[in-house]
Regions:
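N-terminal amphipathic/basic leader segments beginning at the initiator methionine
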Residues: 2-105
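Glycine-rich, charged/polar anion/phosphate-binding loops
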Residues: 65-75, 95-96, 219-223, 231, ...
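Catalytic cores of large soluble enzymes that bind and process phosphate-bearing ligands
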Residues: 77-80, 98, 102, 140-147, ...
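Glycine-rich phosphate/pyrophosphate-binding loop regions near the starts of catalytic domains
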Residues: 85-150, 158, 167, 243-268
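Glycine-rich, mobile lid/loop segments that gate access to catalytic sites or pores
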Residues: 149-278, 288
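A glycine- and small/hydrophobic-rich beta-loop-beta segment
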Residues: 298-332
Length: 332
């Protein structure tokens, strides 16, 4: 026989409802984003045999973002028939910011990115991002670090940039050294894909699928904002299955905008919104070695450059970035 809740119990229930309401509202928004009801292309599961989550939403039709090209290939890291290598190529002068795991022993790609984003010149001219799924290259010591360096070197030669201008990310089995030769062998195919298809409509969907591991559906989001009357676009993809926070789980998130924003400002924005999205919930309490969230600004929109953290012109952009990150967080 049910009992009528006490006044204290009613207050607790009301507090929970109030706390959960923003999440419920945001989830509705994420699933009702204009254009999100039509998938860009069929969304296969990350791992054959897994039941697709009942919370799965169609992958949105994401408009091209200026200054970035994306290509995928099957390098053979993932044991199933699926692309497992994703490469982003960015315009010259692209800014980059990153947030990473707080695990005391980060993976080789995490250490690489943290090293080259640090310092006064860090993140000022990032030209590429290379992501592989199936091998985490974590707990691999010097051999793993050397494999990461060789990967960046090969990509830098292809794209005519410095090694430090290539960001890396990996997800998958821990304790196995990355076979960088598999990536090198696919770079010609990747480069052809980058050159052949200028902003294909499904490039973001392919990228989202290419970074999945145990995910049951690809995750993406997009938004638009204004900076002094110029329209700027933001788009992103994420992976993580039962894994949410960059400092407390296993996730990758990559977001690109065509706004022109200094790396220091980009870092401040990413740090601000990570706290209220990716870092606000954990599922299993485990700390991962590979958590990575990277934000890139290509500067191709024509909007004026933002070089100060407190610039009021960032208001619309900051809100749009929060929307994209919240969407990726909620559908993870």
């Amino acid at each position: 026989m049910s009992k009528t809740p006490s006044k204290t119990g009613q207050k607790i229930e009301q507090a929970f409802e109030k706390a959960l309401d923003p999440f419920a509202t945001a989830l509705k928004r994420a699933t009702r984003t204009p254009g999100a009801t039509t998938p860009a292309e069929p969304a296969p599961a990350g791992k054959p045999g897994l039941t697709i989550s009942p919370l799965a939403v169609p992958f949105p039709a994401i408009a091209p973002v200026g200054g970035v090209e994306i290509a995928t290939a099957r390098a053979g890291f993932y044991k199933h028939e699926r692309d497992d290598l994703v490469v982003f190529r960015f315009a010259r002068g692209t800014s980059c910011a990153g947030v990473f795991t707080r695990h005391k022993i980060g993976s080789a790609p995490v250490d690489w990115c943290k090293k080259h984003l640090a310092g006064p010149d860090g993140g000022k001219d990032v030209r590429a991002l290379v992501v592989n799924a199936g091998c985490a290259n974590a707990f691999t010591g010097k051999a793993g670090a050397d494999a990461a360096r060789r990967t960046a070197s090969e990509v830098a030669k292809r794209f005519g940039c410095r090694q430090r201008d290539v960001m890396l990310a990996s997800t998958g089995v821990i304790g196995v050294v990355l076979d960088d030769k598999k990536i090198a062998a696919k770079l010609h195919e990747v480069e052809q894909g980058l050159d052949a298809d200028a902003h294909p409509s499904n490039q973001w969907a392919r990228a989202a699928v290419g970074i999945m591991t145990t995910d049951t559906f690809p995750k993406g989001s997009h938004a638009e904002a204004e900076i002094e009357g110029y329209k700027v676009r933001i788009a992103g993809v994420a992976k993580g299955s039962g894994m949410i926070a960059p400092d407390m789980a296993t996730m990758l998130a990559f977001i690109v905008t065509d706004a022109d924003i200094h790396p220091n400002v980009l870092q401040a924005l990413l740090g601000l919104h990570v706290r209220t999205t990716f870092n606000s919930v954990t599922v299993d309490g485990d700390t991962s070695t590979n958590d990575t969230a990277l934000l890139f600004a290509t500067g191709t929109s024509g909007a004026p450059r933002i070089g100060r953290v407190g610039d009021r012109r960032l208001k619309s952009f900051s809100a749009a970035l929060d929307k994209v990150m919240l969407d990726l967080f909620l559908i993870n």
